């Protein structure tokens, strides 16, 4: 089973959900604000998805800019960054698609199609 971690008001997240439905994928949704991922979940997803920590940041988000995260994160340890992300779901890139064998950060139609077919 896949989990789509999303912000329901986000148009890109809505597109991702619609694509999963069109593909007939078995998935559940999780609101990134009300059920923010834990630091340990984020650490595991980085490993599982072959991601870099920086790829989990919502760099176009208002909060990222308000907190000057482009510069600030460079002064923070990985643990500090994961803790901050786990307390502020709006800092996390969305949607996140999580399944047993992988993780996708952001929405790319072809990547979603490949993940569902795998």
Report the location of each language-model feature.
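Local sequence-structure signature of Cys/Sec-based thiol-disulfide redox active-site neighborhoods
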Residues: 1-23, 27-32
């Amino acid at each position: 089973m896949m989990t789509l971690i999303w912000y329901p008001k986000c148009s890109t997240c809505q597109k991702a959900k619609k694509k999963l439905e069109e593909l007939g994928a078995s998935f559940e949704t999780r609101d990134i604000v009300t059920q923010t991922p834990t630091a340990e979940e984020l650490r595991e997803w980085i490993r599982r998805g072959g991601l870099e920590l920086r790829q989990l940041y919502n760099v176009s988000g208002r909060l990222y800019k308000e907190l000057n995260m482009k510069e600030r994160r460079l002064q923070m340890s990985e643990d500090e960054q994961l803790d901050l992300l786990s307390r502020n779901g709006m800092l996390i890139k969305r949607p996140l698609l999580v399944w047993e064998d992988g993780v996708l950060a952001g929405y790319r139609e072809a990547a979603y199609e490949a993940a569902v077919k795998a």
